[in-house]
């Protein structure tokens, strides 16, 4: 076996999974991270360096970039200058013989990835097929790929950026949608879109690419809308569904059909028994005639727009956090149709105010706690208080999950909600 000297840049969850995978292959693994504590917490690094350009090792055969690290990072640029192949954990997995033992399905897109992945796994389970979610969903692909069953992989644009060569491994793939997102990382919408489209290079068959809103390539999974709507309507499951959820389920249906037959009755049962993950237009309850909805996962303008169109009217929306180079003015048309007041919070509250205060009533808040208090002081019976930030959470929280949990806790500090 030809053992390599491999740099792993980033010692987070994904980087550690890559280090373990490479170590077991017999490679010499060199870890680089800005935190020495993170480096020494991983036993699979043979050498460790702090994140400095002068620490770039000699005689490196392969460079593994953790997905959260930008391609503009000085060490990534240095690896390119030295003509060292650069990959992410997804490319490592897709090139591994272990990954070919079972069918695999890939899902990417700007919004809806996690819900679609989890529903697809749920649908396959309901059909008696073993299936596992992995990838960007929180289960590192290099660890989860050893499980026996269909691999349903959530893939982010960060993981697809380095996908330059064709690796025909996926039985089917879906690009759910493409809208402005992660411009702080990709710089342009074109570069972001190109990264998403790279999933097509991983398909065994070109006609197994399914696409949705804003995607020009592939077959539209919405071609199944009519038959799906018909069975959902008959089963009483259509009316309670938000449009974007129905579309996500359509995508899952199309992908499931790439590996098995899917009776519509079984699809209906899967929809009826599926529990959506939290923080995604999650209805928390009602008190004094005011409804509360947690959409902390909304970190893009398109996500906020979908939430507003789902809730439709009398909305007091809480927005803000760390800006991802988003254009807040793009929301003005939908905001003026649905929102009665904006509460702008956190690090970019002034940017939001500058963009939107001339179009709608707007109040600024330092943090989420103050934002909830302001929203409650404004709300009247029949209103909806919607947390749909349209921004990253990292100004105040470690994750969108922590932000959503905080919102739920702040709401829970009141009397018990009527669900």
Curated annotation (Swiss-Prot):
The keyword Lipoprotein does not apply. One of its GO terms (molecular function) is UDP-N-acetylmuramoylalanine-D-glutamate ligase activity. The keyword Chaperone does not apply. Pathway: Cell wall biogenesis; peptidoglycan biosynthesis. Its main location: cytoplasm. ATP binds at residues 109-115. It comes from the Bacteria. GO terms for biological process: cell division; cell wall organization; peptidoglycan biosynthetic process; regulation of cell shape. Its EC number is 6.3.2.9. It is found in: Cytoplasm. One of its GO terms (cellular component) is cytoplasm. SUPFAM superfamilies: MurCD N-terminal domain, MurD-like peptide ligases, catalytic domain, MurD-like peptide ligases, peptide-binding domain. Keywords: ATP-binding, Cell cycle, Cell division, Cell shape, Cell wall biogenesis/degradation, Cytoplasm, Ligase, Nucleotide-binding, Peptidoglycan synthesis. InterPro entries: Mur-like_cat_sf, Mur_ligase_C, Mur_ligase_C_dom_sf, Mur_ligase_cen, MurD. It holds the Pfam family Mur_ligase_C. It catalyses: UDP-N-acetyl-alpha-D-muramoyl-L-alanine + D-glutamate + ATP = UDP-N-acetyl-alpha-D-muramoyl-L-alanyl-D-glutamate + ADP + phosphate + H(+). Belongs to the MurCDEF family. Cell wall formation. Catalyzes the addition of glutamate to the nucleotide precursor UDP-N-acetylmuramoyl-L-alanine (UMA). PANTHER family: UDP-N-ACETYLMURAMOYLALANINE--D-GLUTAMATE LIGASE (PTHR43692:SF1). This is UDP-N-acetylmuramoylalanine--D-glutamate ligase. It comes from Chlamydia felis (strain Fe/C-56).
């Amino acid at each position: 076996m030809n053992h390599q000297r491999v740099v792993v840049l980033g010692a987070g969850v994904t980087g550690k999974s890559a280090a373990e995978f490479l170590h077991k292959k017999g490679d010499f693994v060199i870890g680089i991270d800005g935190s020495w504590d993170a480096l020494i917490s991983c036993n699979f690094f043979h050498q460790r360096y702090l994140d400095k350009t002068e620490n770039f090792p000699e005689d490196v055969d392969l460079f593994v970039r953790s997905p959260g690290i930008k391609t503009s990072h000085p060490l990534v640029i240095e690896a390119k200058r030295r003509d060292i192949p650069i990959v992410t954990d997804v490319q490592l997995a897709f090139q591994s013989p272990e990954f070919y033992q079972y069918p695999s399905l890939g899902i990417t897109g700007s919004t809806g990835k996690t819900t679609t992945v989890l529903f697809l796994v749920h649908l396959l389970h309901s059909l008696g097929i073993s299936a596992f979610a992995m990838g960007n969903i929180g289960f590192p692909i290099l660890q989860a790929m050893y499980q026996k069953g269909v691999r349903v992989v959530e893939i982010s644009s960060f993981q697809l950026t380095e996908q330059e060569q064709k690796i025909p491994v996926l039985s089917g793939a879906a690009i759910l949608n493409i809208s402005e997102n992660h411009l702080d990382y990709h710089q342009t919408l074109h570069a972001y879109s190109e990264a998403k489209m790279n999933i097509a290079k991983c398909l065994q068959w070109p006609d197994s690419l399914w696409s949705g809103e804003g995607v020009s390539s592939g077959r539209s999974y919405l071609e199944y809308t009519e038959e799906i709507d018909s069975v959902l309507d008959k089963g009483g499951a259509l009316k309670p569904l938000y449009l974007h959820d129905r579309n996500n389920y359509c995508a899952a249906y199309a992908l499931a059909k790439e590996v098995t037959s899917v009776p519509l009755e079984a699809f209906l049962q899967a929809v009826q028994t599926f529990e959506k993950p939290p923080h995604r237009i999650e209805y928390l309850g009602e008190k004094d005639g005011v409804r509360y909805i947690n959409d902390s996962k909304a970190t893009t303008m398109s996500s906020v727009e979908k939430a507003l169109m789902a809730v439709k009217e009398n909305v007091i929306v809480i927005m803000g956090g760390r800006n991802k180079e988003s254009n807040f003015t793009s929301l003005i048309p939908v905001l003026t149709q649905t929102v009665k007041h904006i509460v702008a919070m956190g690090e970019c509250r002034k940017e939001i105010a500058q963009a939107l205060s001339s179009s709608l009533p707007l109040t600024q808040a330092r943090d989420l706690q103050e934002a909830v208090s302001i929203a409650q002081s404004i709300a009247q019976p029949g209103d909806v208080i919607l947390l749909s930030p349209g921004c990253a959470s990292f100004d105040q929280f470690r994750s969108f999950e922590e932000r959503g949990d905080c919102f739920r806790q702040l709401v829970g500090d009141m009397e018990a909600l009527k669900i």
